[in-house]
Amino acid sequence: MAQKSALIILAAEGAEEMEVIITGDVLARGEIRVVYAGLDGAEPVKCARGAHIVPDVKLEDVETEKFDIVILPGGQPGSNTLAESLLVRDVLKSQVESGGLIGAICAAPIALLSHGVKAELVTSHPSVKEKLEKGGYKYSEDRVVVSGKIITSRGPGTAFEFALKIVELLEGKDKATSLIAPMLLKL
């Protein structure tokens, strides 16, 4: 069986580093190939709290590659940049058309709204709740929400749960559960 793969899209500036790193790390522990793509190239991205992350590739170079999941980290202004990007729109449209999963955490669900990605139910950082509700989404305060092929989560403090849910969906509950003890997580 082929290894599952995840694409994490980094905004040019302002992605939430915990959501990028924790999500990617947990997925890698779950034996999922993780590709970090820079929206504005493969140069280091300055995240919301000042950390710099070096993408593996430019998003445009993997735009047509198939991934099991495309993940949008939150943070500001990173989430707004994702919401305004035509390239992100095209990647999400392709992911929906191919039946792949999409994950968005923190404020990143606003990119789902702006790019017309449908979901029955979402969650997010409280700062964008009203915008999502006004955009027609049914909203939940749950820490992680799975609605069809869309996985959303609330913010940095829910990044482990978000990532474990993705591992569960791609590799099964046993694989996800097996990762908890070695990371000393208390969920």
From Swiss-Prot:
GO molecular function: glyoxalase III activity
Entries under Gene3D superfamilies matching the protein: 3.40.50.880
Broad class of the protein's primary localization: cytoplasm
Cytoplasm listed as a keyword: yes
Annotated GO CC locations: cytoplasm; mitochondrion; nucleus
Leading EC class: lyase
Statement: the UniProt record of this protein carries the keyword Cytoplasm: yes
Catalytic residues as annotated in Swiss-Prot or TrEMBL: 19, 106, 125
Catalytic activity: methylglyoxal + H2O = (R)-lactate + H(+)
Subcellular location, record wording: Cytoplasm; Nucleus
Enzyme Commission number(s): 4.2.1.130
Tissue-level expression: Expressed exclusively in the intestine.
Swiss-Prot/TrEMBL GO biological process terms: cellular response to glyoxal; cellular response to methylglyoxal; glycolate biosynthetic process; glyoxal metabolic process; lactate biosynthetic process; methylglyoxal metabolic process; negative regulation of oxidative stress-induced intrinsic apoptotic signaling pathway; response to oxidative stress
Entry keywords, A to Z: Cytoplasm, Lyase, Nucleus
Pfam families associated with the record: DJ-1_PfpI
Family the entry assigns: Belongs to the peptidase C56 family.
Function recorded in the entry: Catalyzes the conversion of methylglyoxal (MG) or glyoxal (GO) to D-lactate or glycolic acid respectively in a single glutathione (GSH)-independent step. May play a role in detoxifying endogenously produced glyoxals. Involved in protection against glyoxal-induced cell death.
Name of this protein: Glutathione-independent glyoxalase DJR-1.1
Classification of source organism: Eukaryota, Metazoa, Ecdysozoa, Nematoda, Chromadorea
Gene name per UniProt: djr-1.1
